């Protein structure tokens, strides 16, 4: 049996975010509900391959978007150990700023850096994936002191602890897929003006970044 807990969480400035927690006695039960269903779509394999199949799990999904702010945070834990995390944030700056942001989120990234086809830029490591999605807001675009519009983008980062037994190449593919699904959801949520460059299925990982 799966227990679902939902709550309204007070965010910055008194705004509300939806937080949804899934408690399951088995890590493969109702896995389609993970991340509010956002990151799974019709394929649960990328999730189940990255979480142990025996211990109970807890999955939390926070989806907050208001007034040009975005926070999407999906975590899966087994016991007290976090085994999977996917986040999306609206950030300001250039691609170089995104690269610095990504390094701050995955400072210990292991394995060769590779590219995959998603967003404006996307990089893959053995246990991490990150996507840069250009995102000009439909209204209230932030401006600098000179009145010029500030470039904004959605930064998506996915991380798996490697607690589940999975080959590195397959884990790369799964994390690229999960990051892409959350990027797709974030792009729709923020109504970014730029066309969405996210493949329907799993992105191709392989070219060296």
Predicted regions and their residues:
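Hydrophobic membrane-insertion alpha-helices, especially the h-region
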Residues: 1-20
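A small/polar (G/S/T-enriched), proline-flanked helix-loop surface module common
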Residues: 20-184, 188, 195-208
